Amino acid sequence: MSGHSKWHSIRRTKSVLDQRRGQLFTKLARDITIATREGGSGDPEANFRLRLAVDKARAANMPMENIQRAIDRGLGKGGSDAAAIEEIYYEGYAPGGVALLIEAATDNRNRTASDVRATMTKNGGSPGEPGSVSWMFETKGLITIDLSVKRLDPDEVMLIAIDAGAEDVQIDDDIVEVYTDFKQLAAVRQHLIAAGLPVTGAEKTMIAKTTVQPDTADALKAMKLIEKLEDLDDVQKVYSNLDITSELAEQFVQG
């Protein structure tokens, strides 16, 4: 899972630097609305998916009134049209045979599908049929621990995470990524918090069963395509089976 971890870390850094605040808030609001509707409750204590979405929004300094408005939309209050927003996945390939699973939240399937296809085609990718790559991924839980918030021995943190039920632990400088069975995400998260670890995020993720390492040129093109897709307003996340070296990751960040 090391290649995924490195790419995930690079994307986290670049998204903070590149993504417009307004666009970020729109994506976070859609997450909250869908979580509220799917979980059947506007109370984060009773709706774990909503709690994760709200925590993520707060971490991005999203105003509380925006968060509440998104929750109200999910509850159908004030004549809002939460039912119009649906979660949908698109599939395809980036240069180098890199598989892409694209998660979107949209109120217009035709618009989103058109935007995704156009972006992929323009950047050397190829759209795929439903099921063409989704079988390559597994749903997992991802918990992020930031050791710059509280200095702890990384090896000790790893042992605590494994004892809590983690399936894999990746350490990249001060960031520790803990991967879990998705159904155990809430329990593992609570265990880590109770152990005093500085948990800064928890979310659903999709992990590739196997990864690919294309040559440098194709890897850079694949990363650029993923970045372009994630810049689309309706796209929430893009999962891939891309594996890259630390050197290539740095090259991409530096542009």
Swiss-Prot record:
Gene Ontology cellular component annotations, sorted alphabetically: cytosol
Annotated keywords: Cytoplasm, DNA-binding, Transcription, Transcription regulation
Molecular function terms from GO: DNA binding
Taxonomic placement: Bacteria, Bacillati, Chloroflexota, Chloroflexia, Chloroflexales
Family as reported in the entry's similarity comment: Belongs to the TACO1 family.
Protein name: Probable transcriptional regulatory protein RoseRS_4362
Positions of disulphide bridges: none
Subcellular localization, as worded in the UniProt entry: Cytoplasm
Any Pfam family matching the protein: Transcrip_reg
Organism: Roseiflexus sp. (strain RS-1)
Top-level taxon: Bacteria
Xref: NCBIfam families: PRK00110.1, PRK12378.1, YebC/PmpR family DNA-binding transcriptional regulator
Any GO BP: regulation of DNA-templated transcription
